[in-house]
């Protein structure tokens, strides 16, 4: 009877993961792992994507869908080659809510911007500029991307470029440079003008508030006495402080009026230290306990502990047992590493599909969630322009 009873799962998240039903509230259990989007998210796609955390088949379907979108980019023959890239980026953002290395989003960003960076058609396209800005948000230092856009005159007519660039520079405490970037966008009449002017006014308010705070801090500190280790107050400060203490201390009134703070005081003399010095009486010099202090000796006598001659340390040998090493003992300690054949076959199939996609596509890197994409993502995060030609930085 006890064997037939089922153990009730108290954790609601574990209970949901063990179940196969779709409640429509999957995002409630994984919302701390969802990267927010400015345009919002589709709840249906979000729930389906989060369900793939517990369903291996759903995850394989997502990877297969991503592969199809990448192939569609290479096979596109329409008038707007940027549109399949935008569609793929939006789908990856929805289907892989946490983002991360396995999503391949950073690699898609890099290949999209590298595909059209020299195209005159898309230099002023707002969609293309937003891909650049989203790519910059995922990198360790976005300043190199903003400088690249400035050199190649990409997005210079849009206010969102100057706002993002200036806010990034302001975050690095380069207020003067950020102000110059705002003024550059205003002088170029970047659109929309109202958005740029509003962002610049907010920037000036933050700058003035920061300068006022810096000016008020020294005034507040001047009212307090500055005390630090190893420093002494001046004589005037000491006298003023004594007078202030004397006016509030009732015992100070009992002092004589002619008594001054500069009255000399007697120095305490230790009788024992006087006997050890040369001022001791003649009767004490004859005592035997003081003879060692009077006879200091020469330099060789005082430094005899530092002048010992070197000696051999190998005069005594510790007996040791010989160590016998046999080949049989070494071979017996080895063990076989377990290999999952089913997992290896799946990886071989994905690698075969990957190779087929590589042969059919020369512009898009196939993404299968392997180690290569994780490594490439980390390299791009540190150096986002690593695949760009050197002449792309020249004006």
Curated annotation (Swiss-Prot):
Cellular component terms per the entry's GO annotation: chromocenter; cytoplasm; kinetochore; kinetochore microtubule; microtubule organizing center; nucleus; spindle microtubule
Domain of life: Eukaryota
Stored InterPro entries: Bub1/Mad3, Mad3/Bub1_I
Keywords carried by this UniProt record: Cell cycle, Centromere, Chromosome, Cytoplasm, Cytoskeleton, Kinetochore, Nucleus
Residue ranges annotated for the BUB1 N-terminal domain, each copy included: 69-224
Disulfide pattern: none
Expression by tissue: Expressed in actively dividing tissues, early in organ development, in young leaves, lateral root primordia and root meristems.
Motif (Nuclear localization signal): 118-125
Region of interest: Disordered: 210-263, 342-395
Subcellular location: Chromosome; Cytoplasm; Nucleus; Chromosome, Centromere, Kinetochore
Induction data: Cell cycle regulated expression with a distinct expression peak at the G2/M boundary.
Compositional bias ranges of the Polar residues kind: 245-263
Motif interval(s): KEN box 1: 219-221
Residue ranges of the region described as Necessary for kinetochore localization: 59-206
Function summary: Essential component of the mitotic checkpoint. Required for normal mitosis progression. The mitotic checkpoint delays anaphase until all chromosomes are properly attached to the mitotic spindle. One of its checkpoint functions may be to inhibit the activity of the anaphase-promoting complex/cyclosome (APC/C) by blocking the binding of CDC20 to APC/C.
PANTHER family: MITOTIC CHECKPOINT SERINE/THREONINE-PROTEIN KINASE BUB1, MITOTIC SPINDLE CHECKPOINT PROTEIN BUBR1
Assembly with partners or alone: Interacts with anaphase-promoting complex/cyclosome (APC/C). Part of the mitotic checkpoint complex (MCC); interacts with CDC20-1 and CDC20-2. Interacts with MAD2 at chromocenters and with BUB3.1.
Entry remark concerning the domains of this protein: The KEN box is required for its ubiquitination and degradation. BUB1 N-terminal domain directs kinetochore localization and binding to BUB3.
Protein name per the record: Mitotic spindle checkpoint protein BUBR1
Lineage of producing organism: Eukaryota, Viridiplantae, Streptophyta, Embryophyta, Tracheophyta
Name of the gene encoding the protein in the UniProt record: BUBR1
